[in-house]
Structures are given as structure tokens and as C-alpha cells.
Amino acid sequence: HPGSASPATTTLPNMNLAAWEALAEAGDVINGNYAPADGATLGPKKIIGNLTLGNGVDVTVTGVIWVLGNITTKQTSSLTVDPVFGANSTWIIADDPADQATKGKITIENGTTISGSGHLQSHLWFISTNTSTDEASPAITVDNTAYGAIFSAHNGVVRLKNNANVKAVTGKRLYLDQNAEVNYETSEFIDSNFSGSPSGSWGIKSETWQEIP
């Protein structure tokens, strides 16, 4: 908030990408670019290509999604965590280990709706491993309010464009356009669980990612 003291710097938490990507790969593998149909369910899934949500396409996320390309959501599309997740959350990962310089970008266009399962502590966590720190070509671009989303780009820049408003964001750099906001609701992240499926979960504990049996 304006006029308040700057928070102390802290080390970004480690992310167990290998384990989370293994969960996605264990579900199913799609070779090539993928554009789901309206009303589709998606996950756990590994996509060897780009993932694009077209205009007006609504998708229910049913597990971890790992994309070895770029992720783009078009206007009036939506991503919603399956209600059966309850208080659990899950991941959408953009990561090509062989090309993190040009691939692994995430673009959330204006008009996209991102929601958890309907439970206060349910979120959709977007992770980019792209290494761009240039705000003109960011690792993650968010051009819309995304109350149910967390965005992470620990090796790149996250750009929040005009009027973007997100739940939480972490990155090597954060670039905010005019009227963009980050509103941390601490109570919603205490003991939050992230799941590859509704039956298994990971928890946030003291700034580390810890598996919970």
C-alpha cells in the first residue's frame, strides 16, 4: 500500500517441478499443439507443443497440466479447477527444459476468467520457467483480473497489464502497468494444498513446498 514500509526480501521457495511434471506425464501425453474444445476437461496431461484456449472456450482443470511450449488464453475463455478438488489446488506448468529462453511463456488475455474449485483456498497456480526478464517480451503476461490464480516465473519477469488483479505472484522481476494490483489474502494461503489429483496434495509450510501424506 502507498506510504507503507517495503517488505523484507526473502528467498523464493523451491519448486519440485520434476515431481509435478511426472504427475502430468503419468496422466496422458498429447503430441503437438493443442486447443481444447469448449466444455473440455483437461489434466493430468503433458502437452508436447503449445496450449491455446480459443475465444469463449471454457475448460475444467482435473489435474496437473505440463506444456512444453507456450500457453495462451484468448478473450472470454475460462479455466476452472474441478469442484471435486474442494480446498485443494493444482498447477499449470509451461516448461521446455531444452529451450527455456524462448519457450514456456504464459499469456492470459483480457477477458479470461481463472477460478479455483469454489473453495476459498482453492487456486490455479501457473508456473513459467522462461528466462526472459524483458517486460516487452515477458515470461508471463496477465492482462485481466485473475482472482483464483497464482503466477510464478522465478527466472523471468511477470508483467501485469492495465487493470490486472491477481491473487499472488512471484518472479525474478515484477512489472506492473497502470492500475495493476496484487492483493495477497494471507488467510487464503495458510495450509493451502496443491494436488495432482483430488486424492493427493502438497502443502505450503514456512516458505517451502512440502508433500503431505
Per-range role (PLM):
Residues 1-35:
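Beta-strand-rich assembly/attachment modules of structural machines
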Residues 21-184:
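Long, polar low-complexity repeats
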Residues 179-200:
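Low-complexity, intrinsically disordered Gly/Pro/Thr-rich segments
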Residues 198-213:
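Short, low-complexity, Pro/Ser/Thr/Gly-rich segments in the mature regions of secreted, periplasmic
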Residues 12-14, 84, 118-119, 195, ...:
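Intrinsically disordered, low-complexity regions enriched in Ser/Pro/Gly/Gln/His and often acidic
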